[in-house]
């Protein structure tokens, strides 16, 4: 949510912990195939747009992968590298897209080896980087 809003509004800085959902096509397709439990988000998208197979573009338009440029404010991303596979599936692609962004403000990545989904709140390294980011903005 914070990352998406950063393409719309300027602030004194944005912090995104384990940003997502990065790829709703992938996530909702797993749900449709019964590989993971259904979520309210994918169920609602399916009711509005049909399946990921019949209308993948609608799902992609809502995915964070579609919002990897145009950041109006500096942003700190914190991602635990032991997060769920569904989160990490698109993380390298998202990170690369943000790193090559030519119309973004400054982006900083903190990847926590061994960290899980809540790394911003559980990792001393992430907390330190969080505090440094806050103080600089």
Region spans (language model):
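Extracellular/periplasmic catalytic domains that process cell-envelope and extracellular macromolecules
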Residues: 7-8, 68-71, 103
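Short glycine-enriched nucleophile-adjacent loop
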Residues: 1-9, 14
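Glycine-rich, phosphate-binding/catalytic loops in enzymes
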Residues: 8, 31-33, 93-97
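Cell-envelope and extracellular/periplasmic
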Residues: 19, 24, 79-82, 115
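Hydrophobic beta-strand segments of well-ordered beta-sheets in folded domains
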Residues: 13-15, 73-76
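Mobile cap/lid helix-loop segments that gate and shape the active-site cleft of serine hydrolases
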Residues: 19, 24-67
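Surface-exposed acidic, glycine-flexible loop patches that form ligand/cofactor-binding
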Residues: 65-70, 136
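C-terminal catalytic histidine-bearing segment of alpha/beta-hydrolase fold enzymes
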Residues: 76-78, 85, 90-137
């Amino acid at each position: 949510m914070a990352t998406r809003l950063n393409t719309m509004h300027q602030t004194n800085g944005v912090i995104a912990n384990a940003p997502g959902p990065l790829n709703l096509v992938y996530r909702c397709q797993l749900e449709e195939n019964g590989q993971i439990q259904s979520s309210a988000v994918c169920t609602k998208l399916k009711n509005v747009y049909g399946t990921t197979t019949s209308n993948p573009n609608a799902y992609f338009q809502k995915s964070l992968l579609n919002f990897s440029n145009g950041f109006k404010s500096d942003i700190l991303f914190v991602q635990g590298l032991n997060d769920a596979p569904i989160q990490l599936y698109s993380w390298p692609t998202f990170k690369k897209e943000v790193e090559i962004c030519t119309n973004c403000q400054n982006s900083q990545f903190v990847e926590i080896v061994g960290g899980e989904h809540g790394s911003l709140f559980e990792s001393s390294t992430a907390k330190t980087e969080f505090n440094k980011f806050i103080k600089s903005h």
